[in-house]
A protein has these predicted regions:
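Conserved short alpha-helical segments that host acidic/polar catalytic motifs at enzyme active sites
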Residues: 1-182
Length: 183
């Protein structure tokens, strides 16, 4: 439903759709945004936030992080050079990348792998931040693990996120951090 609204109703976007999760977006200084949304009146066991200075895209409130879908929030820093390949793959499965930001496509990739395919988050990390082939072939993984990682690299090659990045995923009862393979 969220993707349909964001795709079909011109100028309308659903930015927060999770149970027991709120997303607040704005362009401005953090202290002004906090006052505007009266964040001091909320309680939570975890928060994700992002201060963004856009370098490649225009700054607008819809592009502000975190990006959310159902019970996931994603914030990221970096430059995702695989955006077009990632977007083309994920759009084959009904997702629409209307906001044209790499964080949006990361959120949809995580949703697709974890929620729709039932892949555990540890394996999601192995897909989107997969080891280099040379690392896979180095013998540092068990035979079973090597086979699993090879399978992910072959089947989900279009979901490998490339470029320098760090990602924080917030979800019900947890946080997960990922970074590119060169760090």
């Amino acid at each position: 439903c969220v993707i349909k609204i964001n795709d079909k109703i011109d100028g309308a976007y659903v930015f927060s759709s999770g149970k027991n999760m709120g997303v607040f977006k704005a362009v401005g200084y953090p202290e002004d945004v906090g006052r505007f949304y009266r964040l001091d009146e909320y309680e939570a066991y975890s928060w994700t936030a992002h201060g963004r200075y856009p370098t490649n895209t225009p700054g607008w409130w819809g592009g502000a992080h975190p990006f959310a879908l159902l019970d996931y929030t994603v914030v990221h820093n970096g430059e995702i050079s695989s955006y077009d390949a990632n977007r083309r793959f994920i759009e084959m499965y009904g997702y629409k990348c209307n906001l044209l930001t790499d964080t949006e496509v990361i959120t949809y990739i995580i949703d697709y792998l974890n929620r729709r395919l039932g892949m555990p988050l540890e394996d999601v990390a192995r897909v989107i931040a997969a080891p280099f082939w040379s690392t896979i072939d180095s013998g540092c993984f068990s035979a079973e693990e090597t086979e699993k990682i090879r399978h992910f690299r072959n089947v989900y090659s279009s979901l490998l996120i490339t470029g320098p990045f760090s990602i924080i995923l917030g979800f019900n009862n947890g946080l997960m951090a990922l970074n590119d393979r060169l760090k």
